[in-house]
Regions:
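Long amphipathic N-terminal alpha/beta scaffold segment
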Residues: 55, 59-97
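Non-DNA-binding regulatory cores of transcription-related proteins
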Residues: 80-142, 148
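Conserved hydrophobic positions within beta-strands
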Residues: 150-154
């Protein structure tokens, strides 16, 4: 795995999400501006509801922009221990199935494929991320009823 390529791919995912949200935000604002307000009809709250929706989208944009900044700031040098910014592989000791992760402060749950390898982003607050923090290559990670071995840290 090439850590730089993975970081670039994850950054693209979040940049694309930001672009989609901004487009959605623009459309929502337009609809809110054109919607009837409560002055037109006592039972119509479309403008209010659309305005609230726009505020929610704005918050998501800000969150994703913060995540994107953090992703772009991830160190490319390999670390000895798993920490925020680590790209690492866990191998299930029972099934020998390997899973690849990129640990971030925020933005967990995204699955991307780089050169045919699936990588899942982990938020540092995720229980499995907490179990992995500070582990080194060949260490065991116990999560739920499974045991994993750390096989690679980049």
């Amino acid at each position: 795995m090439n850590k730089k390529e993975v970081i670039e791919a994850v950054a693209k995912v979040f940049a694309d999400k930001i672009s989609e949200l901004k487009s959605s935000l623009e459309g929502t604002r337009d609809r809110a501006r054109d919607a009837p307000g409560h002055n037109v009809s006592h039972s119509d709250t479309s403008r209010f509801q659309l305005s609230n929706l726009a505020l929610g989208i704005e918050k998501q944009v800000v969150e994703y922009e913060e995540i994107l900044k953090q992703i772009k700031g991830v160190a490319l040098e390999p670390a000895d221990k798993i920490s925020v910014g680590s790209l690492f592989t866990l191998c299930d000791t029972d099934s020998d199935e390997e899973k690849n992760f990129l640990m971030l402060y925020q933005g967990g749950g995204e699955k991307i494929t780089v050169d045919g390898v699936e990588i899942t982003t982990l938020s540092i607050t995720a229980p499995i991320a907490q179990a992995c923090l500070g582990k080194e290559t060949d260490d065991e990670v116990k999560y739920r009823n499974n045991t994993f071995e750390v096989t690679e840290i980049l």
